């Protein structure tokens, strides 16, 4: 069972103003946010969670660039998966079964996919998008 400091049910959220990724426990009757990462990422824009490896994946933007990174819930093993030619990634979704990550980039006006290990990156859609943002993966169950 995946846990953050003993918490098994939680909501993850990003705060771009505070440069942080946070969580709220749903295991208790009161809700207080706790910080997972702060200051190590510049303007986080989207988060998703992989329960298979217990990693948080997040997109972020900086001055003139952006990226897709991940880390374990215990704040270790922070790594950047995709950085080159990533500008303003504003949405991401994990394919837990296929071990892929999909993201939108409103700077490059594309939707891309890559493996969760940072390999096999490719563009899915590059024409006809003005400001792609949120993305949801509708995976078949079963």
PLM segments and residue spans:
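Surface loop/turn motifs at the tips and blade-to-blade linkers of beta-strand repeat domains
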Residues: 4, 35-40, 81-85, 124-128
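Residue-level detector of Asp-centered blade-edge/turn motifs that repeat once per structural unit
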Residues: 5-7, 50-53, 95-98, 137-141
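Residue position within the beta-strands of beta-propeller blades
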Residues: 13-14, 57-59, 102-103
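Short loop/turn segments immediately following the C-termini of beta-strands
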Residues: 16, 52, 61, 106, ...
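Short coil turn/linker residues within repeat-based beta-strand modules
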Residues: 18, 28-31, 63, 75-77, ...
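Structural motif
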Residues: 18-25, 64-70, 109-113
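Beta-rich catalytic cores
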Residues: 43, 64, 88, 107, ...
């Amino acid at each position: 069972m995946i846990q953050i400091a003993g918490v098994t049910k939680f909501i993850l959220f990003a705060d771009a103003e505070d440069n942080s990724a946070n969580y709220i426990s749903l295991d208790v009757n009161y809700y207080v946010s706790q910080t997972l990462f702060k200051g190590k990422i510049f303007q986080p824009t989207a988060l998703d969670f992989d329960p298979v490896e217990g990693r948080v994946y997040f997109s972020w933007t900086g001055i003139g660039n952006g990226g897709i990174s991940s880390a374990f819930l215990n704040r270790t093993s922070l790594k950047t998966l995709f950085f080159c030619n990533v500008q303003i990634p504003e949405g991401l979704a994990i394919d837990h079964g296929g071990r892929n990550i999909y993201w939108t980039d409103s700077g490059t006006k594309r939707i891309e996919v890559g493996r969760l290990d940072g390999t096999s990156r490719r563009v899915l859609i590059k024409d006809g998008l003005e400001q792609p943002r949120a993305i949801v993966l509708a995976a078949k169950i079963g």
